[in-house]
Amino acid sequence: MIQSAKELLKKGAAELGVQLDAAQLESLNLFAEELKKWNRKINLTAITGDEEIALKHLVDSLSLLKAVRGPGRLLDIGSGGGFPCIPVKIVQPDLEMVSVDAVVKKISFQKQAVRLLNLTGFTALHVRAETLAQEYAASFDWVVSRAFSDIPSFVAMALPVLKPEGRIVAMKGRSAAEEVEGAKDKLDALGAGVLEVMDFTLPGTGDARSLVVIGRN
């Protein structure tokens, strides 16, 4: 990435309370370059400019660390081009990651990025999330996604693979208060409830973001 994008990445992460060291910055930069290279051949993301990638993919992914900290096991459902799981893994290597997406080319990219970055404790799977319960029942401390539009559907998919005291984190691209209120009865029926809603502004953009943290009742 160009120097201004690297500076935005470092500054944006710091505003979220994440201090990136030189090695982490270099790994995030390598990941961004690999994303751009693959994106010229296959459609991984509509966000292609360096500064946009730095803020709307990398810093946005790292915002998950407001709610999640290692060690532990984390499942990212609908991870696409590796967001938020790969940036979070770079910064929190003690999180064991499983990343799933239904699009094979996106998982192929993730596997290549993981090899390039020498990340260990990271499994990328081309499966539908609905099929995970058999192999991964009650396996994860955190189940996260920034892909779901509907919180109850995400929670229903996450609960079978969540440890009893585990947490579900829905990353929302706007203030989530209204959606959370509307989902309350459906979550209650699933035996789950919202524990916390963390509203914030994505650094460098002015865009509203929310992390909705959910647990079992």
Curated annotation (Swiss-Prot):
Family annotation (Pfam families): GidB
Domain of life from the UniProt record: Bacteria
Catalyzed reactions per annotation: guanosine(527) in 16S rRNA + S-adenosyl-L-methionine = N(7)-methylguanosine(527) in 16S rRNA + S-adenosyl-L-homocysteine
Major localization class: cytoplasm
GO CC term, one of those recorded: cytosol
EC number of this enzyme: 2.1.1.170
Keywords per UniProt: Cytoplasm, Methyltransferase, rRNA processing, S-adenosyl-L-methionine, Transferase
Residues where S-adenosyl-L-methionine binds: 78, 83, 129-130, 146
Gene Ontology molecular-function annotations: rRNA (guanine-N7-)-methyltransferase activity
Cellular location(s): Cytoplasm
Role played: Specifically methylates the N7 position of guanine in position 527 of 16S rRNA.
Matching PANTHER family: S-ADENOSYL-L-METHIONINE-DEPENDENT METHYLTRANSFERASES SUPERFAMILY PROTEIN (PTHR31760:SF0)
Family classification: Belongs to the methyltransferase superfamily. RNA methyltransferase RsmG family.
Descriptive protein name: Ribosomal RNA small subunit methyltransferase G
Encoding gene per record: rsmG
